[in-house]
């Protein structure tokens, strides 16, 4: 990574970032059993809505392909004349769900103010451009240190909660925490340190960091590296699954994939405070995988699709199917949630954690 100075700012640039899987998960919408909400308020589709004829192309990663196919089949059972397909690249997509959108690319996106009621969203994560909502947050996304308690129990070692504890832990020094990519390093360590050093959240979202807090954050990151508790590794997942590391720095989406290969006796815990000293606020940065609609998309077809996607029943089904925390406010009390999901929310609701919501507007460079 390197920095460039521009107008009193230090522009933080990563090595060419490997784009995270563009999160695009559309669940089965249960339209046959529940009906759909028509614009006439009757709870059923009007004949004019059913008669809409159009095509919608969605750009997504293969990780979400099967979920989108299920959603398309369910949606088409009610709207047979709206064909949903897949785009080969972002430039030809009508609908895109991504974790990043630069202001330059935002010029080509449609305003979504009238698509759904935005009161149920975390307002800080609504993606605004020129005063209009162009992006609707779907899933919460965060990066941080994940620990498996099992290796600590085997070594009779204490599980660290703060940087001071990690530095003084013989187990962490012998089996350091590993980081595999620059994106997780930026969001999980550098950005929280930048906030602790007096930097602004808006700077983090744009990637344009003020020099003084950035320099302090870089010095603290350097000390973490010198202490040996955090190391870069080409295959951090392999070491974490085998129990040969004290923890792994990765995104929530990545830990869900990793969990599938973990031993049954493993107990995963989320620890965003590893980069924070004692008596210092733990900054947990939350972003969102956000839905965008291209300006060239057929607006009525897109409105119908987006409206069904963000309905309460659909969001609850999304949570159940994907284990991803929702950026839409819904009541999950009567629904069974996976342990890793509860672990994330217990940290999110902790009074010891300062939650900072950020929209990622960085350029790809």
Predicted region positions:
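Conserved N-terminal structural module of periplasmic/extracytoplasmic solute-binding proteins
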Residues: 2-4, 8, 12-14, 19-25, ...
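A ligand-binding cleft/hinge motif common to bilobed small-molecule-binding domains
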Residues: 101-107, 249-266
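Periplasmic solute-binding protein
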Residues: 122-160, 179-204, 285-293, 364-365
